[in-house]
């Protein structure tokens, strides 16, 4: 979010859970008008303390925000859980105001830890993380770009969260790059 602290923003978070991201926005942008969509009723009730939260499934495409359009729509580790992430992005794009942006955090299945496990014959789901057992879709950097293009969105700023990458991981990535057409090591993070 690049506006000044006093900007009167309209922000919508899809899958807002208990509202932690929306609370961060409110703390940094006190004039922001906050909205959320959350499928879990208990979490929606909590988030409703700081935002106008609609309890429901965004994929049913029946949201009514009273004609309000948004400066930002946030998808924080949500798209990989949806049956139709592209359709949902297209639907939500209709709620953006002119010049509005979608902010998304999407796990990279081409992460060095997943690739290392794959070449050793493992693709083990977990209760959280890159291989969360509730993920329906998996994306690589290139697949994220393709999905955005198909939905008529443009990637303006993409950043990789490089957490817990060891020197051994970096050396492994260098070897992978020698074997592949990938020329940007960040695609493995």
Q: What spans do the regions from the language model cover?
A:
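Conserved SAM-binding loop
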Residues: 2-116, 140-145
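S-adenosyl-L-methionine-dependent methyltransferase catalytic module, highlighting the catalytic core
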Residues: 20, 83-189
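Helix N-terminus capping/helix-initiation residues
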Residues: 1, 57, 180-184
């Amino acid at each position: 979010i690049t506006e000044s602290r006093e900007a009167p923003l309209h922000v919508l978070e899809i899958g807002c859970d208990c509202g932690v991201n929306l609370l961060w926005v409110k703390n940094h942008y006190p004039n922001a008008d906050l909205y959320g969509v959350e499928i879990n009723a208990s979490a929606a009730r909590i988030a409703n303390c700081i935002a106008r939260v609609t309890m429901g499934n965004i994929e049913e495409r029946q949201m009514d925000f009273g004609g309000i359009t948004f400066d930002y729509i946030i998808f924080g580790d949500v798209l990989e859980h949806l049956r139709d992430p592209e359709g949902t992005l297209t639907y939500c794009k209709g709620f953006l105001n002119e010049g509005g942006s979608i902010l998304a955090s999407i796990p990279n299945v081409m992460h060095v830890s997943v690739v290392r496990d794959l070449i050793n014959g493992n693709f083990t789901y977990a209760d959280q993380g890159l291989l969360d057992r509730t993920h329906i879709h998996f994306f690589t950097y290139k697949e994220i770009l393709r999905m955005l293009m198909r939905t008529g969105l443009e990637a303006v700023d993409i950043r990789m969260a490089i957490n817990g990458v060891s020197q051994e991981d970096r050396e492994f990535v260098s070897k992978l790059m020698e074997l592949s057409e990938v020329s940007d090591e960040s695609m493995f993070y």
